[in-house]
Amino acid sequence: MAATQSEIRYLTPPSVDVKKKKYCRFKKNGIKYIDYKDPEFLKKFLNEQGKILPRRITGTSLKFQRRVAQAVKRARHLALLPYVTDLMK
């Protein structure tokens, strides 16, 4: 009985996911200013409901995440981006 418990058999072998290293696209491309008047660019940082995606998903640095959040909020205030939506993308 002890021998059967130590042998664990899987129907499919367990896969080890190789995660890509996240990088800040602003630092990599040398972007200094995030334009709040460009809603197509800002949509990359929003989910389907219109919420701002967190840093752990987008990979942006803290400095540029703050700038993205400020730009999205300005665009929402000017009605360039919606505050809430069902399906954005």
Curated annotation (Swiss-Prot):
InterPro entries registered for this protein in UniProt: Ribosomal_bS18, Ribosomal_bS18_CS, Ribosomal_bS18_sf
Gene3D superfamilies: Ribosomal protein S18 (4.10.640.10)
Cellular component, GO annotation: cytosolic small ribosomal subunit
One Gene Ontology term from the biological process aspect of the record: translation
Key words of the record: Ribonucleoprotein, Ribosomal protein, RNA-binding, rRNA-binding
Keyword match tRNA processing: no
PROSITE patterns assigned: RIBOSOMAL_S18
Residue ranges of the TM segments: none
GO molecular function term, any single one: small ribosomal subunit rRNA binding
Pfam family, one: Ribosomal_S18
Keyword rRNA-binding (UniProt): yes
Record family assignment: Belongs to the bacterial ribosomal protein bS18 family.
Subunit structure: Part of the 30S ribosomal subunit. Forms a tight heterodimer with protein bS6.
HAMAP family according to UniProt: Ribosomal_bS18
Function: Binds as a heterodimer with protein bS6 to the central domain of the 16S rRNA, where it helps stabilize the platform of the 30S subunit.
Name of this protein: Small ribosomal subunit protein bS18
Species of origin: Parabacteroides distasonis (strain ATCC 8503 / DSM 20701 / CIP 104284 / JCM 5825 / NCTC 11152)
The encoding gene: rpsR
